[in-house]
Every structure is written in C-alpha cells, then in structure tokens.
C-alpha cells in the first residue's frame, strides 16, 4: 500500500516538467519512490536513463525488487559489452534503463545516442555530485541538445548535502535544476502517517560490565586529549572538534577537508593525531559491538602494527584500555595459589604453566589441570557480552507468548513468523547465531583458543629489533605524560615477561591438545542434526581456518592450518549472502535446561536489503540500533497497519552507542533545518533550467587571442576561431578532466588509444598521472613502458602530474626531504626517468582547471590532432609495419622486437645488448662470459646461449 506522503512526493515531482532535487530522510523508502516513478513512465514519453554509480548498487537492487513485486517489467542495465548498434536500439526503445555515467558520456560524445529521444535522466546519488563530476558533464551535454529533457535527482543523505560551502546550491547549478523538495522525518504529513499505527516498542537498556565502563571512559579521555592537542595547532576549526562529532565517520572528512590544503606543512605529530582519532572511534564502536576476546585481539593488532608512532598509545589513560580489556578475558594468578585451590575443588577455567612444563593434562568436560610448582598461570575469565543473555531471554519470552496464544486458541497467524534480529555486520550475525545455537561460554572458549593460537603465529612473525628507533622530540607523548613502562617495552619488564610466557605456555598446551584430539577423532567429525522445519538457513560466512570445524565437534583446536593473525573485525571475511539465519535446530544442541527458541533470522544492516518485505516478521530485535533501519520499521508498519509488530531495542545504558544513535537523529534534523533556511534564501538564476542553452554552449569559454585585436585590422572584426579538439582515451573518463576540458570549449573525441591518454596535436602526447597512480606506476614499472612508447611515436612526450585541488601541491613536507638519493624516493625515480628519456617533458598541475589552462596554452601554436592517425599509433598493420615510429629512423625496429623476445632478454638489459652489438649476427657470436656481463647475470646469459646453439629440428 502506497503511503500518502509517497503519493504527495510523486505528484510534486511530476508537476514540474523540468524535474527537481528530492532530499529525503534516511529510511523513508527512497527506492519505492523511484520504483513508482519508473512504473508511471510511458514509452511514448521517450527513453528514461538511471545513472548508476558504484555506491548506488544496493539502491538498484531495492528498486528492482519493488518493481518485480508488482509484476511490472524491470529496467535492464546497459553495459559496455553490448555492441553499439544494440545500444542504439535500446536508447530509442522508450524504456527505462540503468547505465553507468562512463558508458553514457562516451556514447554522447560519439553521438551514438539520439538525445532527442531521451525523456529524462534520474540521478540516484545527488549528494555526490559536483561541478566536475561525470554526471554534471552528462547533464550539460543533454541539456544543450535537448532542453526539454527533465532531470530528477534523489538523495537520502541530508548531512552530505550541507557539507562544504553552498553544497546544495552548487549541486542544483550543476544539474540545471531550479526546484528542491525537502521531506524530513519531522514533516507534518510524514510524522502523522508514521505515528498513526506505531509498532509496539520495548526499549531495553542493558548495563555494561564494570570493565566495559572503564574502557569506554578511558577511550573518551584519550580522544578528548587528542582533540585538545589538535586544537593547539590553530589550523582546524575548533567548533567541529568535539567527542560527539568524533563518533561519526564524517569527522574524518571534516578534519581532512580542513587540513588537506596544508597537509605538507603539518608535523608528524599532527598527522598521527588525525589517524589516532580514527582508531579511537573504531575502538568505541568495537567495544559495544564485539565480544571481549575479539576486542582484545584488535588491541593486540594495534599494538603490533602502530608501534611507537601512535600518540594515543602513550596517553595516561591508554594503559587502562589494555588492562581492562585483558581482565575481561583472563587474569594471572600464582601457581602456588592454584595448587592450593585444586586441593579444595576443581577449577572450571584452564590453568597453564608459564614455563610450558605440563605434568598432566586432562580434557574432561572442558576442564584442564596443570601441576606446577613455580611461576604464574593464566586463568580464564571470558566475560560474555551482556547483550547475549538479554537476546536469549527475549527469544525465550517470544516463544512462551506464542505457546500461550496457541493454547488459548487465539488468532495468531501474524505472530508465528520469523523473529528478525538486526545486527551491524555479518560477523555479529554469525557470532550471535553461535550463541543461541550453542552455549555462549563455548563460543567464548572457541574465541579464546583461537586467540592463544594467534599468539604463537604472531610471535613467529616478529623479528628482533636491530636498532632502536629514534623517536622525534616530543613525539609519542600526550599532555606531557610519559608512561612508566611503554607498551613496546612491556614484554621486557618482569611482569610483562611472565604474562607473555604464561600465554605462550597456554597456547602451546592448546596446540598440543588440538593435535591429539584431531588424531583421535580422525575423519569422524559428526555434525549436529539440523531440523530445517524450525528455521531457515542463509549462506554462512566461511570460517577463517579449519580449526573452528574441529572446535564444533570436540571443543578443541587443531593446528593443521594457520590461525588467524589479524583479529580485527574489519579483517573478517564477508558472506556473499545478505543475512544469516539461525538457529540450526537450537533445541537439538542447546545446553541442558535451556528453553525452546523460535525460528530466528539474522540480518546484517550493512547489506542494505529489503528484508522486511521479504520475510514480513512479527517480532524484530534491533541488536545494533541504526537510524535508517528504525525508519524502515516505521514505514513497514505504516504500510501494513493490520499486521502486529513488536520491536525490541537493545541499548547499552549510558554508552556511546546511545549517544551516537541520538546524535545521528539530531544531526539529520539540523541538516534539514539548514536546508530549509537555504531554500528560503536561495537565489536561482532564471536560465538555470537549461532551456536557454544553445547547441554549442558551455559554462566557460577560453580567452580569445583576438580580444585585444586592433580596430584597424579589418575594422575590428574578430576572425572565426577554429574549434579546438582533444583526443581522449576511453579509460580517462573515470576522471573529471574531460569534463573540465569541455567546459573550456574544447571538443572531446573519445577513442581507444594504445599510446598516451590525451593527444593535443600530431606531435604532443600526454600521459596523465594522479599522485596515487604515479606511485603505483613506478612500483609496477608500467610508467617506464608508457613513457618509452610515447617517446617512440611522438616528438613531444609529456608526463602530466596532477594534484587534487583541495590537497597540498607538494609530494612531501620540506622536513621529509633528505639529501640522500635512494632508489625508493619518488624524486629520485622521476630524475632517473627524465635522464633516461631526454625528450620527456614534465607538467605539474595544481588542479583540473590548471590542467585545462595548460592544455589550452600547449595547443595555441599546434595543429589539431588527427583521430584516425591517433588510433593507428602503436598498432601494427597487416604487414607488421607501425606508422609514425620515430625509433625506426635510427633502429631496425623489427630486429629490436625480435631481440626482446629472446630468452633471458628483458626490459632491463636489452639496451646494453644493443649498445654492444650492432646486429643479431654479432650477438650470436658472443661467448657466454660476454653475454653475462651485458645481461647482468650468468643464468640469463646461459639460457640465451643455449637457445642460440639449439639444433634446428628437421623431418629428415
């Protein structure tokens, strides 16, 4: 059932024939709105194109799902695999299609699409549009050729529409739109409809453990200290530097947007603080999302990877983070105390000798005993997540209510559906499935044993320090506080060494025990019985090693495969499916005394699938609160007012989880309030709808050389300018430079080039490199080959190094530049490249617009490039002749190509061979010793010599 505010939005969009920009609150079914507009589209109006960016793939799947649920034909996607004639027929069919901006812009420039047959274009990611984006390039061309085509842009991220200066106004200008439609959650029509039949909501606040409270407090203290340090730089807007804003990913964007232009002037300490704030935000998130052992794994990974460079590791409160995280998992006790306690009663936790001397190990009921006389032992604590117990209680309560309704013979058809549990990510889904299928303590024990095994692997990877790293003065110290024992040297202290040895002993014992159990069990690994009538099963995530399968059967680990080394949650593999269902007949494997559970389906919020319309659950447990999903629940209940729906929200009381959820709602409301104010005062030009554009118009025109022409020359008349054109490689349309060149009035000719990225004239070829691509090309050696090909076929080969406009115009800060010439330094690599290719010219560009100005200057005294000739460059003809080969004037190119294909000859040594040998015949007469000197090794020289001396096979 379509909601009334949905119908109102659709009618508002259809009223304006030119289109408009729709900004909707997150979770208010943007996909359903777009699907409704596609269903209302008539083929007689013309073809409708939906620009599909990589970030809009989940939105595309939702649109297709909603259209197919109404038995309407779903739009197909136009891909590059389709031939040009087939794409042309699709463009003229009048149906809606998904298409990527790169394919569409190339077809527009090559005139493979009849623009007059287009009814309109949908922009699915309006919040990511800028003046230089490919989508803006497309709209400008379409509007110049077909001013009646409508443009409708959509976004459900209002926060992104207010980031930066006049973001909304610039977006509307780039899309040639004059009308904006704002539909926040607090809009009267929306709030009334969603609150008319609200679901039954149960808000459960779970108290965090004392250690979790201590860790959260310590992280916030460290984060606050880092923010205070950043404020001292006087280079960041202090209003944005708050702990609350630091809880969101957008905080990184805010800080980097301010610091990127001056990034090369910042010291190492400030740069590290930016990275540390991102790490601390992850710690706050992982604290409430994952179990105690996984959190400790991630901390250990940080301690190894970040080393002395991190400032936050040396803060006074950081010790509490590591200490409390350890106490949630294990504690160290004296071996003498363990021995005395074992005389009184058996301990359920495992004891391990710090020296690794285990007199007896018994594996009975999950218990082990270690007889030791000295040292310390590791005693398991394995604190369970407080939410786990609450989740199981809710499931048991739900099943009891359903049984009562069944006995009372009430109509409970709506209450027998699947219980949906919404989690943040796939890893949480898998772990919660294990918890309700098995004993939570068993799950924690599996994680604990994997953690111990990872300790062994981590120790084998560590290399001894050859030389102590010299730390810059004041670097790694926060607020002037230096810890008594640094984390890097913690293993060197007495207590730290004892703890490390105790963990190694425990890990070794588990490793030995796992091998013994694996040998005893052999191939007999029974799986628990699964009753598929009581649950549905999605595709589960792969286990990191085969150890988990062994643990499922005997609760012990094997060591046949490598244990997990990087235990951070972001390193977990994601499942291909959107969600995971459980339990696998929880009643068959549930612990004794546990109650029966209803069928449960775990849903990962990050998958962004229309799970509510597919499963139609009657009970939903929001394990990880998310604002967008809460709105989806409201819309789902409003669309199904007669269906009973009970929603449980599980929060950690007084945690950053609650603070982040409430702040996300507040930030969205503030964004809409800002948009409403902007809309009331927004000045929109009358011709912004594109109706006044000519066929050859563009937003900018290059300065004419005849602007200052003398009046005595032909009465002051300006000579007719010849249209400048640039040949652009197809792959370059992933960047924004072709768009900017088109804005400058240049004609863009997209072709597939074998040599170069941009052809400015018959003699000028340009290879464009962004900073990241430049480093990668040097590493792979691709740049050397590209420059070699340009030098071979063009008189003026040019390497364009293009910086981002909002970042620093520098490779590195002045303090990082050393006097030493090293082969790994980027400046050294560029110097060697220029020395090797003397005709190569380097261009340094500050931004896209600066590049366009440089191209205009370079083309001022040059002829226009020939498209046909540029396509043939580097491509051999049927006779094997390559046109415009400059190297052929001095070298026999056929002989050179033959030489490079000989065994042992590579790009690194064929030039030295050419300098020594004048012909292939002379090369064949050289002895192995001389070849070894030329080729840089005896092995490659021997392979070439054997090839040259090989006998020619004959049939006689």
Curated annotation (Swiss-Prot):
Region (Disordered): 343-363, 516-593, 697-718
Keyword DNA damage part of the UniProt annotation: yes
Highest taxon of source: Eukaryota
Gene this protein is translated from: UVH1
CDD domains: XPF_nuclease_XPF_euk (cd20078)
Enzyme Commission code(s) on record: 3.1.-.-
Molecular functions per Gene Ontology: DNA binding; single-stranded DNA endodeoxyribonuclease activity
UniProt family annotation: Belongs to the XPF family.
Assigned keywords, A-Z: DNA damage, DNA excision, DNA recombination, DNA repair, DNA-binding, Endonuclease, Hydrolase, Nuclease, Nucleus
UniProt short sequence motif Nuclear localization signal, positions renumbered to this chain: 256-272
SMART domains (alphabetical): ERCC4
Coiled coil: none
Biased amino acid composition, Polar residues: 697-711
Tissue: Isoform 1 and isoform 2 are widely expressed, predominantly in flowers, meristems and stems. Isoform 3 is detected at low levels.
GO biological processes: DNA repair; double-strand break repair via homologous recombination; nucleotide-excision repair; pyrimidine dimer repair by nucleotide-excision repair; response to oxidative stress; response to radiation
Quaternary structure, from the entry: Heterodimer with ERCC1/RAD10.
Subcellular location: Nucleus
ERCC4 domain boundaries: 725-805
Cellular component aspect of the GO annotation: nucleus
Organism: Arabidopsis thaliana
Protein name: DNA repair endonuclease UVH1
Function per UniProt: Seems to be involved in nucleotide excision repair (NER) of damaged DNA (dark repair mechanism). Involved in repair of UV light, and probably oxidative damage. The UVH1/RAD1-ERCC1/RAD10 complex may act as an endonuclease making DNA incision 5' to the lesion site. In vitro, is implicated in double strand breaks (DSBs) repair and is required for homologous recombination in the presence of non-homologous overhangs. May mediate the induction of a DNA-damage sensitive cell-cycle checkpoint during the G2 phase.
């Amino acid at each position: 059932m379509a909601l009334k505010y949905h119908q109102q939005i659709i009618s508002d969009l259809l009223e304006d024939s030119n289109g408009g920009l729709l900004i909707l609150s997150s979770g208010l079914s943007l996909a359903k709105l777009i699907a409704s507009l596609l269903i209302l589209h008539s083929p007689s109006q013309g073809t409708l194109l939906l620009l599909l960016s990589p970030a809009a793939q989940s939105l595309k799947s939702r649109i297709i799902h909603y259209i197919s649920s109404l038995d309407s034909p779903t739009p197909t996607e136009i891909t590059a695999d389709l031939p040009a004639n087939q794409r042309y027929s699709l463009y003229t069919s009048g149906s809606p299609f998904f298409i990527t901006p790169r394919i569409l812009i190339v077809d527009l420039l090559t005139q493979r699409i009849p623009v007059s047959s287009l009814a309109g274009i949908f922009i699915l990611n309006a919040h990511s549009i800028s003046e230089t984006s490919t989508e803006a390039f497309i709209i400008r061309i379409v509007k110049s050729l077909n001013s009646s085509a409508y443009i409708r842009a959509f976004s459900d991220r209002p926060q992104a529409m207010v980031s930066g200066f006049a973001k909304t106004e610039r977006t509307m200008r780039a899309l040639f739109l004059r009308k904006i439609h704002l539909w926040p959650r607090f809009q009267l029509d929306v709030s009334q409809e969603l609150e008319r039949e609200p679901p039954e909501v149960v808000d459960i606040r779970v108290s965090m453990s004392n250690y979790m409270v201590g860790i959260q407090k310590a992280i916030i203290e460290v984060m606050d200290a880092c923010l205070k340090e950043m404020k001292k730089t006087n280079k960041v807007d202090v209003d944005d530097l708050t702990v609350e804003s630091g809880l969101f990913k957008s905080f990184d964007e805010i800080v980097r947007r301010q610091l990127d232009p001056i990034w090369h002037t910042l010291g190492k300490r400030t740069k590290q603080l930016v990275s540390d704030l991102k790490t601390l935000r992850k710690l706050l998130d992982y604290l409430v999302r994952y179990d105690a052992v996984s959190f400790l794994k991630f901390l250990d990974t940080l301690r190894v990877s970040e080393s002395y460079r991190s400032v936050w590791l040396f803060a006074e409160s950081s010790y509490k983070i590591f200490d409390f995280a350890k106490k949630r998992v294990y504690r160290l006790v004296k071996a003498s105390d363990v021995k005395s306690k074992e005389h009184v009663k058996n301990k359920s936790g495992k004891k391990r000798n710090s020296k690794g001397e285990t007199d007896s190990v018994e594996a009975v009921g999950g218990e082990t005993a270690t007889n030791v006389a000295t040292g310390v032992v590791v005693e398991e604590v394995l604190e369970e997540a407080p939410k786990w117990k609450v989740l199981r209680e809710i499931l048991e309560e739900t099943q009891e209510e359903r049984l009562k309704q069944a006995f009372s013979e009430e109509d409970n058809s709506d209450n027998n559906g699947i219980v949906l549990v919404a989690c943040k990510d796939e890893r949480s889904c898998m772990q919660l499935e294990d918890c309700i299928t098995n004993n939570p303590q068993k799950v924690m024990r599996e994680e604990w044993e994997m953690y111990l095994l990872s300790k062994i692997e981590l120790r084998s990877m560590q290399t001894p320090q050859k030389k102590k790293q010299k730390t810059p003065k004041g670097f790694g110290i926060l607020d002037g506080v230096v810890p008594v024992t640094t984390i890097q040297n913690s293993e060197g202290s007495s207590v730290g060494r004892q703890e490390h040895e105790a963990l190694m002993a425990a890990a070794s014992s588990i490793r030995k025990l796992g091998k013994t159990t694996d040998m005893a069990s052999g191939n007999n690994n029974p799986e628990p019985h699964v009753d598929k009538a009581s649950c549905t099963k999605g595709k589960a995530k792969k286990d990191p090693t085969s150890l988990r399968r062994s643990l499922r059967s005997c609760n012990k680990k094997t060591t046949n495969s490598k244990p997990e080394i990087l235990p951070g949650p972001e390193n977990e593999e994601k499942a291909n499916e959107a969600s995971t269902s459980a339990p696998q007949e929880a009643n068959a494997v549930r612990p004794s005394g546990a109650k029966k559970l209803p069928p449960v389906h775990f849903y990962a919020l990050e998958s962004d699938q229309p799970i509510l319309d597919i499963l139609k659950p009657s009970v939903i447990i929001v394990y990880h609160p998310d604002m967008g999903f809460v709105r989806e629940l409201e819309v789902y209940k409003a669309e199904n007012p007669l269906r009973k729906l009970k929603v449980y929200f599980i929060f950690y009381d007084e945690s950053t989880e609650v603070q982040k959820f409430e702040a996300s709602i507040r930030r969205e409301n503030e964004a809409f309030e800002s948009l409403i104010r902007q809309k009331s005062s927004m000045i929109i030009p009358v011709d912004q709808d594109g109706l006044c554009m000519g066929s050859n118009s563009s937003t900018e025109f290059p300065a004419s050389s005849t602007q200052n022409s003398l009046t005595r020359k032909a009465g002051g008349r300006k000579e007719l300018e010849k249209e400048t054109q640039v040949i652009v490689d197809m792959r370059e349309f992933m960047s924004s430079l072709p768009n900017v060149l088109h804005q400058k009035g240049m004609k863009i000719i997209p072709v597939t080039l074998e040599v170069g990225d941009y052809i400015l004239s018959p003699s000028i070829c340009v290879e464009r490199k962004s900073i990241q691509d430049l480093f990668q090309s040097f590493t792979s050696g691709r740049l050397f080959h590209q420059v070699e090909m340009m030098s071979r076929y063009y008189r003026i080969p040019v390497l364009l190094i293009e910086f981002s406009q909002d970042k620093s115009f520098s490779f590195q800060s002045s303090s990082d530049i050393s006097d030493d010439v090293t082969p790994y330094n980027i400046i050294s690599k560029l110097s060697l490249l220029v020395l090797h290719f003397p005709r190569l010219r380097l261009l340094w560009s500050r931004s896209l617009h600066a590049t366009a100005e440089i191209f205009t200057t370079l083309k001022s005294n040059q002829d226009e490039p020939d498209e046909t000739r540029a396509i043939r460059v580097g491509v051999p003809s049927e006779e094997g002749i390559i046109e415009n080969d400059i190297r052929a004037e001095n070298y026999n190119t056929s002989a050179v190509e033959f030489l490079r294909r000989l065994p042992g000859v590579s790009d690194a040594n064929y030039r030295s061979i050419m300098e020594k040998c004048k012909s292939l015949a002379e090369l064949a007469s050289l002895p192995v010793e001389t070849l070894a000197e030329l080729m840089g090794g005896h092995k490659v020289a021997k392979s070439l010599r054997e090839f040259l001396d090989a006998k020619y096979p004959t049939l006689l």
